[in-house]
UniProtKB/Swiss-Prot annotation:
Protein name: Threonine--tRNA ligase
InterPro entries: aa-tRNA-synt_IIb (IPR002314), aa-tRNA-synth_II (IPR006195), aa-tRNA-synth_II/BPL/LPL (IPR045864), Anticodon-bd (IPR004154), Anticodon-bd_dom_sf (IPR036621), Beta-grasp_dom_sf (IPR012675), TGS (IPR004095), TGS-like (IPR012676)
Species the sequence originates in: Granulibacter bethesdensis (strain ATCC BAA-1260 / CGDNIH1)
UniProt keyword annotations, A-Z: Aminoacyl-tRNA synthetase, ATP-binding, Cytoplasm, Ligase, Metal-binding, Nucleotide-binding, Protein biosynthesis, RNA-binding, tRNA-binding, Zinc
Catalysis: reaction(s): tRNA(Thr) + L-threonine + ATP = L-threonyl-tRNA(Thr) + AMP + diphosphate + H(+)
Amino acid sequence: MPAITLPDGSVRHYDAPVTGTTIAADIGPGLARAALAMKVDGRMMDLSRAIAADAQVVFVTRKDEAALEMIRHDAAHVLAEAVQELFPGTQVTIGPSIENGFYYDFARNEPFTPEDLPAIEAKMREIIARNAPFEREVWDRQDAIRFFQDKGEKYKAQLIQDLPDTETITVYRQGEWLDLCRGPHMRSTGDIGPAFRLMKVAGAYWRGDHRNAMLSRIYGTAWRDQKELDAYLHQLEEAERRDHRRLGKEMDLFHIQEEAVGSIFWHKKGWRLYRALENYMRRRQIEAGYEEVRTPQLVDRSLWEDSGHWDKYREHMFIATVEDEEKTLALKPMNCPCHVQIFRHGLRSYKELPLRMAEFGACHRYEPSGALHGIMRVRSFTQDDAHIFCMPEQIAKETADFVAMLASVYRDLGFDSFRVKFADRPESRAGKDEDWDRAEHELREACRLAGVEYELNPGEGAFYGPKLEFVLRDAIGRDWQCGTLQVDYVLPERLNAEYVAEDGARRRPVMLHRAILGSFERFIGILIEQYAGRFPLWLAPVPVVVAPIVSDANAYAMEVVTALKRAGVTWAEADLRNEKINAKIREHSLAHVPVILVVGRREAEQRQVALRRLGSQEQQVMALDEAISALATEATPPDLRQ
């Protein structure tokens, strides 16, 4: 009979299978009221499920982070019930919890509109108030298929048909309504609480395939209490204010147009920002012992077949056929196979390892148009990509050195902290299990020796190896996964990379794939939103504008600009237009220019400037030399400051 071990180490013995509800009640009435679900040996389960064997049990209450996913999952079910009550004949498809919320996809003749959301949300609150219990039922597979087919729910029937034969078919009832679901769920609809809101409608293809029917998706957000909901809604407002697409337009940084969907037209100011970041990263990599290379954009399919990308990644590749040569080429989606070709060009010695090879490599990956998002999710992008060819005993030091470099770069760019996730082997992968065992062991050991603490991200490794994912948190609390480090024994084997070891034998190098920014385009989008367009001088596309009050000061304004440029403030500008000074200040403030130097006759005569910072109404009168020295220091990239 089951022995139930609780988090405090105490053990409760039962003479028969026991439910979580009973255990919680035995512990005390407070827990019986607060418990929403339970973890049984680490697996989330309904409180109503019976435990028949010895197990470790942890109860989940509203205070626990794990409750959020339960609240959102249950809210998705209530959303589906509300829609079917209000819009009979609507078919339900899938409705998962997602980061910060949930959604449900519906099949109906007319898509939902934002105007439908208030009524649906009101109906959801009505269903929650009914406090109907969630009840789990196990059904026969064929009975379940017939049931949903008879209801006209063809998508649910298809989902069941596609499940493995070994999968148990379960449905959950909430009052008179039910849905196909693996669970788990909380006790009742009332446990969801009032802290939710429907956010928007969108279109989505069934199973994400553009060849399938277009469905109507409703997104919502749900939280543990009103305070959390209000904080999230405030974050969304702040995110809208910082949206890189809007700021990019206001600051004249870039644009995107239909003739090149998923690719960026960089304007001169945006390209200045891009180049400032690229030059900074180039210096940091040179300092860390990387050699920069350049590899082709179009590569024959044979290399992608050898590397495994053709099988695992072909649907994301842009492919071209050269008819007169009967060749099939692909725009490279990543740089690693090409870097192996450089490593293989000539006989390598163990004395050359670790060999650190870097490239600001342009890559192309197909993304559905609906998934594209400004410059953050595109089809054509450049990575700060590098590969370290090393021996197994060098992995730990290279990992530690990389993490130290990454942390320093992030600090320079305005991010003081980051989290690390360990992504292990995915279901679809290349290589032998023993190679994966070795790679995962080596990466865990490298993390231990480097003092890197991580959380597990199961099944999210690359198809050729496990990886560390470095997650930034921005100024408004959003997480961005940017940097990566991957350990790869597979690609050197597939592409026949080798070196001569100290004993004269030929050996395979270990390949470490690493990036700090990820893609320049996405990271610049993150930077725009992190700073809300208010860049530090060293990154600002226009760091300083000199604005004369009267035309008599134009010559002095140009002299100031020349002095700034000589001091290293390369993109300083003068605004010599015949406009009132307040209009100039307003215009350049809206363009997020960090510093405006106001000059008039008196400033010209006394060799001074009136310095005005973005967001401030105050002007600081300074000697010209003093101002130039201070601004030149601010405009110097952090890695070049003394």
